[in-house]
């Protein structure tokens, strides 16, 4: 079956260093793995007519928050041609991860102001049909393997694994909801990757940060131990990048890109690592230590391995298991750490 993955507004970047594009590449890889012929719309390689495909999968980004922010407004927004094209789709549409947002309702209320004439080329009635008749899809491959974590968790994807990535979810918040709530009965092998946000923003706000970190790790471990699964693993957290790194406002908490100095946060990170490693030493829980290749000669998370030009995430080019280079139009390499993990 011929499949198109597209985005209604901003084009999916072909840049392998883009975190937003990484999730789209993962979806493309999963659909390819189950036997489909997949075209991923990326900047510079946009399919002219979506209706030549059997099915269309729509990617809304990996941080959809429920509202549209159009750069340039209704007068100068640069992605209108993409929406015009999208609004004319007649093929079966699947909405990736979330219910299809009601874009037509969000935009129609803005049509009375000072707008560009091209907005009148949008097929509003058909766009409304797409929104109402699309089918949500979350798990593309039928698999018993899952990675669970915050937005960093997508970096642990590889074929045969489902990733339940929950943006902005702290370890503290995940434990309150229970780790078991993030997995389904068909999942028998699970990896967990929470805690980076807690180190960046929260643990150094505690009265006794070191004690709070150990308590959090022990609570994490205890819930991992309670899971009725065949295999459970937990990932080491990311190193700390240099404080000069520019972080988008979406990564701020209380108007700050982080709380605590580099040394303080690195100390908390190492306490987190050492405590979890100690707990897992004689346990059925596997601790995955993996970050050494990301660290520069100053002991920092190297900017080379991070999303370009800014943000807190890894570049897909530096993911440990899989990089999906072909989805950015690049040749594949064997630069993974799979042998290291075995």
Language-model features: locations:
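Histidine-centered active-site loop/cap adjacent to the catalytic His
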Residues: 121-137, 268-269, 277-278, 286, ...
């Amino acid at each position: 079956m011929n499949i198109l993955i597209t985005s209604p507004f901003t084009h999916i970047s072909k840049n392998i260093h883009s975190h937003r594009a990484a999730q789209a590449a993962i979806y493309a890889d999963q659909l390819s793995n189950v036997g489909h012929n997949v075209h991923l719309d990326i900047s510079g390689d946009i399919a002219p007519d979506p209706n030549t495909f059997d099915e269309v999968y729509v990617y809304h980004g990996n941080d959809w928050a429920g509202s549209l922010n159009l750069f340039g407004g209704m007068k100068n927004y640069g992605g209108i041609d993409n929406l015009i094209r999208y609004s004319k789709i007649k093929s079966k549409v699947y909405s990736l991860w979330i219910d299809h947002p009601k874009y037509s309702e969000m935009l129609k209320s803005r049509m009375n102001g000072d707008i560009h004439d091209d907005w009148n080329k949008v097929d509003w009635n058909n766009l409304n049909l797409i929104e109402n008749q699309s089918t949500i899809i979350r798990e593309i491959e039928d698999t018993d393997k899952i990675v669970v974590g915050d937005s960093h968790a997508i970096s642990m994807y590889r074929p045969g694994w489902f990733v339940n990535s929950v943006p902005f979810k702290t370890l503290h918040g995940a434990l309150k909801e229970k780790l078991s709530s993030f997995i389904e009965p068909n999942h028998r092998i699970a990896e967990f990757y929470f805690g980076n946000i807690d180190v960046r923003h929260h643990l150094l706000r505690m009265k006794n940060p070191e004690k709070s970190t150990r308590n959090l790790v022990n609570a994490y471990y205890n819930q991992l131990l309670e899971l009725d699964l065949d295999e459970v693993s937990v990932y080491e957290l990311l190193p700390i990048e240099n404080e000069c790194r520019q972080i988008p406002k979406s990564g701020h908490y209380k108007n700050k890109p982080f709380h605590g100095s580099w040394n303080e946060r690195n100390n908390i990170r190492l306490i987190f690592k050492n405590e979890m490693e100690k707990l897992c030493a004689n346990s059925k829980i596997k601790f995955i230590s993996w970050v050494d290749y990301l660290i520069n000669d100053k002991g920092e998370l190297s900017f080379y391995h991070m999303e370009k030009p800014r943000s807190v995430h890894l570049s897909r080019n530096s993911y440990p298991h899989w990089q999906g280079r072909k989805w950015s139009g690049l040749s594949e390499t064997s630069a993974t750490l799979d042998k290291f993990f075995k």
